[in-house]
Amino acid sequence: MKEELFKEKSRYITGFVLIIVAGLILYADNLLLFWAVLGGVYAVGFSEALRLFQVKASFSLYLILVLSWVAAYFNGHPIECALISAMVMASIIAYQKEHHSEAILPFLYPGVGFFALFGVYKDFGAVAIIWLLVVVVASDVGAFFGGKLLGKTPFTPTSPNKTLEGALIGVVLASVLGSFVGMGKLSGGFFMALLFSFLTALMAVFGDLYESYLKRKAGIKDSGKILPGHGGVLDRLDSMLFGALSLHVLLYFLEVWKETAVFLGD
């Protein structure tokens, strides 16, 4: 009983600290600061992914991680750096027999998600990150309490504790709340922000499920222990990483569509 109370207390304290830190970083609104902090988080998440995929850590893995993250700071399209890092790792696997084929996986997850998260900030600013946070947090909170109150139907064998009703409530709540934040970012207004929030929330749900699947497959409860009461970095950011990729793609193609419309109009 005492252990459960201590864990619950640790969970709230850690959550409060994370909110304060995230708030200060977004308030500072400095690209270098955001890149540096997120890079450190990525390194921890990458180490956790090595454990999930049962890949042995090596110098070459972390060298590619560091070089690709540095390149992302200077590259106009950070996600490209994630894909290139995966291609470089695949080339090393093909050339040498030092690594198993699974060594490419951490560069895809969580790699692509972290680069997408950096891309959301770099390309679309702090408001887009706040939008993403609102969507993901609302989805998680709505799913938890919705499942507790109304949940009856199991959502998936991957995560037996989650219910279909909870997931739906979470997505609806995230879509509505997210749209109020996102509409200030989009010229299309409320309904386009609602659509983008819905698609991002949907991807966030599957990010959480994928992390649950990996942990179940690896036979572990948490991806790490760095966050008291929460587990590892990936335990906290699984939904965020999938949601970031979704939101970045949506916002990017919206920008391309606008530029194309202007070009054709001229």
What is the role of each PLM region?
Residues 2-163, 167-199:
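Membrane-embedded alpha-helical bundles of polytopic integral membrane proteins
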Residues 19, 174-175, 236, 243, ...:
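Hydrophobic transmembrane alpha-helices of multi-pass small-molecule transporters
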Residues 23, 60, 152, 220-223, ...:
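Hydrophobic alpha-helical membrane context
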Residues 43-53, 136-152, 164-165, 202-244:
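Acidic (Asp/Glu-rich) catalytic motifs at the cytosolic membrane interface
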Residues 251-266:
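Juxtamembrane boundary at the C-terminal end of a transmembrane helix
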